[in-house]
């Protein structure tokens, strides 16, 4: 009898071990709302990491939740399948011009980790990186940006998030009914979720760095100055944009929301009726209505985006960004050498330069987004002529003056607002602010996405190129030559050292001088060159035209 019991016991133990070992091939994590099962991926150089995709961090913003601030995620029964990404939020497909993609149920995030807590015998928690995607607040999704370069040799937990876009994310009635900024409040909800749950993935909630490029950079800067986001992160990386860029704060959002209500056959005089009616309309139709505010070639950048909230119990943006005090944490800010090149390339497609020459006064206010800033038509047209004379003299817009067009867009849309943000944060904070200009141009660029023939290695890096050397961008070029791989290591090192210590590239700390706290001092920054060298530089300005302030 004893032998029989022993045999049965061993058999049960074997079966139990077999089931446990088999189950262990599927990584599982317990978060506050339930259990999730993920999968595996491999980094650029073949390191195996865990991935948990499409995790809901808030309730679906559908039906009565449409236009509401994000609502708490509801617990689920069973095991959540986190091996496939969640849907992108409704927006315009990049490069398509007008195609609407995504779903309204879209508030998901993705978590990547090199090791889970049970594998970490020392019990040390890892630094956390949260990436907020760009896309003008009307396109993009978190899954497009992966940590496959960052996690090659670094033990970080990486999170990417989705948030509501366009009208569904940023409509406002200008009062307490629909206060606006729901897309940014989604991001806050994601940051709160991370505070509650990231330990389950081995992450340290007290060491969170938020990053973003373009509208993602604007988002990061907005979190840096929003009282709603205080205490949710410890460092910030801002790439190619800021809350001070003209496109970052949308104008006349309440008026635009009423216009959409009228377009959808809804009342326009009562905010409650506007919102109730719009909740009954097809989500894709509302998302597509965004295009009514981009009259030429998807300009202006952001008809709907962050807006100052005039009412509400808790405001994300209680005042204009320039009047808000930033949280006192280390900040790393950057800009590409030729931010405007991607836009001048896009504008030159399909006879665009001729259209621009023939309709300069009409198109320029939309390209540079001062169509609302300067309401007087005569003054608006005069400003257009002043700008043309400043950048082009008496020359027409053409392939020969494309660099002039790039410079104009760089100055107005990125250079002024980004450098101003760096100076503002540095002047207010005790923590250091670092600024660098990315000057390396490799085998691939965003420019090649629109016009491959116009791009060649060493041309000039443009908007978004820098990010592709830190985060693997889904569907884009994979760098496979020695120089580009070297730049990946360089950029990853800059980020990694900043994430760990609040100081970038600690081996060359004498070159990384913080931005001066005195606004009267020359602007200090580090230049990353085509030869992959670092140069400490100072300028009285960052190259932005002096009269640019007048129409900012």
Curated annotation (Swiss-Prot):
Residues at the active site: 214, 339, 463
InterPro entries cross-referenced by the UniProt entry: AB_hydrolase_fold (IPR029058), CarbesteraseB (IPR002018), Carboxylesterase_B_AS (IPR019826), Carboxylesterase_B_CS (IPR019819), Type-B_Carboxylest/Lipase (IPR050309)
Protein name listed in UniProt: Esterase E4
Carbohydrate-modified residues: 81, 269, 371, 404, 443
Catalytic activity entry: a carboxylic ester + H2O = an alcohol + a carboxylate + H(+)
Pfam families: COesterase
Alphabetical UniProt keywords: Disulfide bond, Glycoprotein, Hydrolase, Serine esterase, Signal
Domain of life, source organism: Eukaryota
Its biological purpose: Overproduction of nonspecific esterases is a common mechanism of resistance to organophosphate insecticides.
Signal peptide: 1-23
Additional observations: This esterase confers insecticide resistance.
Enzyme Commission identifier(s): 3.1.1.1
Keyword Amino-acid biosynthesis belongs to the record: no
MF term (GO), any: carboxylesterase activity
Entry-linked CDD domains: Esterase_lipase
Family classification: Belongs to the type-B carboxylesterase/lipase family.
Membrane-traversing stretches: none
Cysteine disulfide partners in this protein: 89-106, 266-277
Keyword Cell cycle listed: no
């Amino acid at each position: 009898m004893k032998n029989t019991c022993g045999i049965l016991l061993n058999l049960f133990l074997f079966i139990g071990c077999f089931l446990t070992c088999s189950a262990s091939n599927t990584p599982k994590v317990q978060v506050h709302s339930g259990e999730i099962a993920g999968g595996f991926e491999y980094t650029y150089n073949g390191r195996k990491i865990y991935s948990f995709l499409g995790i809901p961090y808030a309730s679906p913003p559908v039906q009565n939740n449409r236009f509401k601030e994000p609502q708490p995620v509801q617990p689920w029964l069973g095991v959540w399948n986190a091996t496939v990404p969640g849907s992108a939020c409704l927006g315009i497909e990049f490069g398509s011009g007008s195609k609407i993609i995504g779903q309204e149920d879209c508030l998901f995030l993705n978590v990547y980790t090199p090791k889970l807590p049970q594998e970490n015998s020392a019990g040390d928690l890892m630094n956390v990186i949260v990436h907020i995607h760009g896309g003008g607040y009307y396109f993009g999704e978190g899954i497009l940006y992966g940590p496959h370069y960052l996690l090659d040799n670094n033990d970080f937990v990486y999170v990417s998030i989705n948030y509501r876009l366009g009208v569904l994310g940023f409509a406002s009635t200008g009062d307490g009914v629909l206060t606006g900024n729901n897309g940014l409040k989604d991001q806050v909800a994601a940051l709160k979720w991370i505070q509650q749950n990231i330990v389950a993935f081995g992450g340290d909630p007290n060491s969170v760095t938020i990053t973003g490029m373009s509208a993602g950079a604007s988002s990061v800067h907005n979190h840096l100055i929003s009282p709603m986001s205080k205490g949710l992160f410890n460092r910030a990386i801002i790439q190619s944009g800021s809350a001070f860029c003209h496109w970052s704060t949308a104008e006349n959002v309440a008026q635009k929301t009423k216009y959409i209500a009228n377009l959808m056959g809804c009342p326009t005089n009562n905010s409650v009726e506007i919102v109730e009616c719009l909740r009954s309309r097809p989500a894709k139709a509302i998302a597509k209505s965004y295009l009514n505010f981009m009259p030429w070639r998807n300009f202006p950048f952001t008809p709907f985006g962050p807006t100052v909230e005039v009412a509400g119990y808790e405001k994300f943006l209680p005042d204009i960004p320039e009047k808000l005090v930033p949280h006192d944490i280390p900040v790393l800010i950057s800009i590409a050498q030729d931010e405007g090149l991607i836009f001048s390339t896009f504008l030159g497609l399909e006879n665009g330069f001729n259209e621009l020459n023939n309709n300069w006064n009409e198109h320029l206010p939309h390209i540079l987004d001062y169509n609302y800033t300067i309401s007087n038509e005569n003054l608006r047209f005069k400003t257009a002529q002043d700008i043309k004379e400043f950048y082009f003299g008496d020359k027409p817009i053409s392939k020969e003056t494309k660099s002039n067009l790039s410079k104009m867009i760089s100055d107005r849309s990125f250079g002024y607002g980004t450098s101003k943000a760096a100076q503002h944060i540095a002047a207010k904070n005790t923590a250091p602010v670092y600024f660098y200009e990315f000057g390396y141009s490799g085998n691939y660029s965003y420019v090649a996405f629109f016009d491959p023939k116009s791009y060649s290695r060493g041309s000039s890096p443009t908007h978004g190129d820098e990010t592709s050397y830190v985060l693997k961008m889904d569907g884009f070029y994979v760098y496979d030559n020695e120089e580009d791989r070297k730049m990946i290591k360089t950029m990853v090192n800059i980020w990694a050292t900043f994430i760990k210590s609040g100081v970038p590239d600690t081996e060359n700390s004498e070159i990384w001088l913080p931005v001066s706290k005195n606004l009267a001092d020359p602007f200090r920054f580090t230049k990353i060159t085509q030869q992959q060298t670092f140069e400490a530089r100072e300028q009285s300005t960052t190259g932005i035209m002096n009269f640019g302030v007048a129409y900012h």
